[in-house]
Amino acid sequence: THESLSILESIDPDKLPVELRKTYYKVYMHVCHSYTKLQNDSHYRDKYIELALRNADSYLALERGDESEYLSVQAYKFYLEKNYQQAINTIKTLQKRDDVKPYLSAEYLYYLGLVYLELGDNYKRVSLEAFTRSAIISNELAMTNLLSLLYVGRLLINSNNPYAHMADEYINVAVEDAVIFGDSYRADLIKSTYYYTLQINLERAEARKKTLEIVAVVVSIFLVTLGFCLF
């Protein structure tokens, strides 16, 4: 991430054509967002949130307000500002647009689930529904949305839902999905990590719940690192 930021900081966006400048600001936001997810120090995390917000403002100043990309970045800005209800409203507006393709609609459902998670336990069920719908639509479109399945599994693990026993099944589907649709390097990495984690905990039946949580977290970290996560 530091290397990516150094490269971005070496570029003067004002010297780029407008379309490339938009891309520059979006890449900058993505890099900052990735860094905040890996950063435990609140001081540095806040610093990169501020940087992401600054680039969001720069992007919004260039994009037309009636474009779906404008609304997408605006929703992300609301999310960073912890204005979660506005973020939810904007994402729902995006989903109703005719120019939003089905696979993007599935991604927006996933983001919606993430925002609902920020609102606390009272919204956990709504978040679970959004993740589930996102996963279903994604599978219908024959595309991978592994994090949706993993989040569903993790939510089920930590709930008294009558379907909690399906948590490991969701995680299994996510891993197998990676094996089928991912490139060989990514698939092998996810699969070996997953089965290694299971193996070292196999004899600890009483720790089954904890095992699944570790598996979900480890696989999630690898997927984020490998670029599956955006929002």
Across the structure, where does each feature detected by a protein language model lie?
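A "functional boundary" signal
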Residues: T1-A205
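Alpha-helical transmembrane signal-anchor helices
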Residues: N201-F231
